[in-house]
Amino acid sequence: MQNFKELGISDKTVQTLEAMGFKEPTPIQKDSIPYALEGDDILGQAQTGTGKTGAFGIPLIEKVVGQQGVQSLILAPTRELAMQVAEQLREFSKGQKVQVVTVFGGMPIERQIKVLKRGPQIVVGTPGRVIDHLNRRTLKTQGIHTLILDEADEMMNMGFIDDMRFIMDKIPAEQRQTMLFSATMPKAIQELVQQFMKAPKIIKTMNNEMSDPQIDEYYTIVKELEKFDTFTNFLDVHQPELAIVFGRTKRRVDELTSALLSKGYKAEGLHGDITQAKRLEVLKKFKNDQIDILVATDVAARGLDISGVSHVYNFDIPQDTESYTHRIGRTGRAGKEGIAVTFVNPIEMDYIRQIEDVNNRRMKALRPPHRKEVLKAREDDIKDRVQNWMSRENEPRLQRISSELLKEYDSTELVASLLQELVEANDEVEVQLTFEKPLARKNRSSKGGSRRSNHKRGNGKFDNKNRRSKGSKGQSSKKKNQKKFDRRDKQQKSGNQSLKGRTFADHQK
């Protein structure tokens, strides 16, 4: 394996990288760095988490050291990714007088203009704000020799394809080296490459990265009305360190977040209507382990680069393979194992098969946890929580009350009563989620109404007996629709058979 020095990186940068713990380049870095140093255009197909920031950032530092004015522009789909890229570049260039600045929306543009006047060598920004500065002429392009597009397909998905064209057209082509990195290569990105890049060197690590055995992929067949209970049962059994949960709509994210909070889980939500300040606050909590469940839409989660995510749950199945790829790519990073679970209605199985066919690998069928598994997991969780409480120093007032209670009651009965109160406080909370009709079968239309479903945990049971439903005018239509989906479920009986006898624990052996 080549080291960074053998790839042509200077001693100063190599020392910095070694101090950061980077002794050997990743595959994408090994293949990209020599071409980047030569000034060749690069088309890299790789996911976030494969070391691609180093693939373009390390050689970029070598090129801008000692230069004056803006030398490079890096485009990123989101503010968070722009900040992460900028921070990593600052780490790579420690002690080398390289200035890196970020420009993105949601922050005062006047402050950014002031920083740009100082002539930083590297500017990292989102397309919209970069265009604002280009139109104001506060971002000078005449000295830019390197343009980098990070997660180009994400920018395209967010509607920035015309913005990317505009920006690429503004930077002089004769002196421009262009590096474009993307997890997928849709037609619009291919057209961008043909129009603006000069005989790019193609670096493709996707096949290996996407097939990474570090991510165990599962699907579980579940009806819409049972989905929330099944999901919380999985949470209790899996006990994820950090989990990202994907919902299809903003409403779904809001309702899921509220439902999880009401059940005692530490969760926050992200979607397009969340303010920038709130978004940064939520991400900070997630990274600092103040919350362990992040509920998000596809758009809100784009560009996130958070280490330590152990589980990804697709509460709503994604509508296309690209979205699925980006979702599960949030886990299984840096050599750590990850788990991705997709909840699928029986009539949505065509989408699972499509994902499997495109990615050329099969997901494992996973049946929902048994009641005994859930209860055991909750008992273990209670014991862990009590153990943590016992390590804290108690207030004298509470110790006095405790002594008085122990004189009056049996200690075992007293503890059991307190624990029962603790458990039932969350179990008795009734949760309401708006019914989301399943995705239509491929080449077929799907009918469905808008209704609401009530979910209640009910002391670990996840059957229908503990579910209370409120009367409403639409109750008769709800029964008709349920019969319709039940008939469809029977048609998919063969799919359900594959789940028999298979548990999450079975797949871990």
UniProtKB/Swiss-Prot annotation:
CDD domains: DEADc, SF2_C_DEAD. Residues 214-375 form the Helicase C-terminal domain. It is found in: Cytoplasm. Coiled coil: none annotated. Residues 33-203 form the Helicase ATP-binding domain. InterPro entries: DEAD/DEAH_box_helicase_dom (IPR011545), DEAD_box_RNA_helicases (IPR050547), DEAD_helicase_CshA (IPR030880), Helicase_ATP-bd (IPR014001), Helicase_C-like (IPR001650), P-loop_NTPase (IPR027417), RNA-helicase_DEAD-box_CS (IPR000629), RNA_helicase_DEAD_Q_motif (IPR014014). Residues 440-509 are annotated as: Disordered. A motif (DEAD box) lies at residues 150-153. Its EC number is 3.6.4.13. Residues 483-492 have a biased composition (Basic and acidic residues). Keywords: ATP-binding, Cytoplasm, Helicase, Hydrolase, Nucleotide-binding, RNA-binding, Stress response. ATP binds at residues 46-53. One of its GO terms (biological process) is RNA catabolic process. It catalyses: ATP + H2O = ADP + phosphate + H(+). GO terms for cellular component: cytosol; ribosome. GO terms for molecular function: ATP binding; ATP hydrolysis activity; RNA helicase activity; RNA strand annealing activity. A motif (Q motif) lies at residues 2-30. Its main location: cytoplasm. Residues 440-459, 467-482 have a biased composition (Basic residues). Belongs to the DEAD box helicase family. CshA subfamily. HAMAP family: DEAD_helicase_CshA (MF_01493). Oligomerizes, may be a member of the RNA degradosome. DEAD-box RNA helicase possibly involved in RNA degradation. Unwinds dsRNA in both 5'- and 3'-directions, has RNA-dependent ATPase activity. This is DEAD-box ATP-dependent RNA helicase CshA.
